[in-house]
Amino acid sequence: MTLRFGLELVDRLARPLLVIILTIVLIWKGPIFLPIAYSTSGPTILYPGLSFPASFRFAPDGRIFFTEKNTGNIRIIQNGTLVPSPFASLTVATDGLEQGLLGIALSPSFQSDGFVYVYYMGWDGTTYHGRIARFTALGNSGTGRVSIFDVADPTPSTTNHDGGYLRFGPDGKLYVQVGEFADPSQSQNSSSVAGKILRMNPDGTVPSDNPFPNSLVYALGIRNGFGMDFDGQTGQLVETEAGPDRDDEINLIVAGGNYGWPICMDTCSNPSFINPIASFAPVVTPSGIAYASPRRYYFGEWTSASLQKLTLTQSSTVASISQVWSSPNPYNGVTDVVLGPDQKIYFSTSTEIYQYDFSGSAEPTQPSSSWTVIYVAIAVAAVAIAIVLVVSRLRHQKTIDSGPNPLSSVFTFLAARVSG
């Protein structure tokens, strides 16, 4: 009696559950995708054995200029080979992990003026300085060094949060990420260039159309960023920013925008601050980011030693973030990401430069939450079907219906949805 009662109870619960789950599946308006195994060739190492390439850029003739973070050398790769002698060398402060020779940018008019810009941390005997030097390329040698920017670290005893990333915008201006030098109060200090994104003319002077009169400041409330790029269609500036022990961010930068640090992190209710489009917890330390195609970016992660793909919606919200590659060496984090002249993604780690042909690649991605619901629904429906069949058999009853088996119709429908 007890066994029979238990079987009847299971049968009564399983049948309504089956009806509910199958109803959800049947009214679903989108196609039903089943998980498949993706294959992709993945990134390949082009240049191994490098000395901590912090940032790199392509010249119009195909040469790659890159900074060696800890040596202070600017190096060139030409025709697939590292040029033996440095393009130029700087004396840099390397007392902290985040110091050294950092960002690099080539003039938009490089073919005519040969200008190469680098950001580095220097030491004057008492204070650390964030500096931008400009060289003129004469073949593979840098000449005519000129200093166009210098900011003294407001907290001389600190050696981190130096920023240092450089990027020329479609407007021909030089954009600079400057960290707050481990002094959070600098980010909201309008008279300081620390904790900001700066916008300057190629000679270091203030553009007349900057959002704050007579100031290099373009955006404030920045903690410490080392990655930014411009949307190739809209010109939108996108930057990555490292948080403290949580809330790393990806931000859409607008002129005069305030991004909240240190008053708030991640999403803020204060309308004075602009919220990130993505935040990460725990930290991943996002680094270089590159626009690849409409609404698609690739960015590096230092902490997780990986390359990620960011896809945006038409309204510039995050559609998905998925991992494309991770280093077998967890200490070989990604430092910079660049779209090459061949429309392939290039990225550097602490020892190599990689190439990734993302066009036509079937990249491994995580299913969206809506597809996850469908996967779970199908799985639960399968369990419910199994329960009904087992219970019916144990009770030695007749078939569910004297007519055509409804389960057969369901499986036929699902098969048609999947194949269509």
Residue ranges of each PLM-predicted region?
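Hydrophobic secretory-pathway targeting helix
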Residues: 11-34
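Surface-exposed loop and turn segments in beta-propeller and other repeat-based domains
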Residues: 85-97, 145-159, 202-218, 260-280, ...
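Beta-propeller blade signature
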Residues: 131-139, 190-202, 253-254
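Short, conserved, GDST-rich strand-edge loop motifs in beta-rich repeat architectures
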Residues: 176-194, 248-249
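Conserved blade-ending motifs and adjacent loop-strand segments that build the rim/top face
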Residues: 319-340
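Juxtamembrane/start-of-transmembrane alpha-helix segments at the extracytoplasmic/lumenal side
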Residues: 365-379
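C-terminal membrane-anchoring or membrane-association module
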Residues: 386-420
